[in-house]
Amino acid sequence: DRDSCIDKSRCSKYGYYQECQDCCKKAGHNGGTCMFFKCKCA
């Protein structure tokens, strides 16, 4: 699911969101970015 990482990691809007990237990559996406403290997979 594209948004499966939203609930797993509350990330910082600015700064380091490696957790989001890792979660999205495990889900089969290229990576992820953080918007409004929520992880969005790309």
UniProtKB/Swiss-Prot annotation:
GO terms for molecular function: potassium channel inhibitor activity; toxin activity. Coiled coil: none annotated. It is found in: Secreted. Keywords: Disulfide bond, Ion channel impairing toxin, Knottin, Neurotoxin, Potassium channel impairing toxin, Secreted, Toxin, Voltage-gated potassium channel impairing toxin. The keyword Secreted applies. One of its GO terms (cellular component) is extracellular region. Expressed by the venom gland. Disulfide bonds join C5-C23, C11-C34, C20-C39, C24-C41. Pfam families: Toxin_17. The keyword Transmembrane does not apply. InterPro entries: Ergtoxin, Scorpion_toxin-like_sf. Its main location: secreted. Belongs to the ergtoxin family. Gamma-KTx 1 subfamily. Negative results: does not affect human Kv11.2/KCNH6/ERG2. The presence of a 'disulfide through disulfide knot' structurally defines this protein as a knottin. Has the CSalpha/beta fold, which comprises one or two short alpha helices connected to anti-parallel beta-sheets stabilized by three or four disulfide bonds. Blocks in a reversible manner human and rat Kv11.1/KCNH2/ERG1 potassium channels. Also completely and irreversibly blocks rat Kv11.2/KCNH6/ERG2 and human Kv11.3/KCNH7/ERG3 channels. Also weakly inhibits Kir2.1/KCNJ2 and Kv1.2/KCNA2 potassium channels. This is Potassium channel toxin gamma-KTx 1.8. The lineage of its organism: Eukaryota, Metazoa, Ecdysozoa, Arthropoda, Chelicerata.
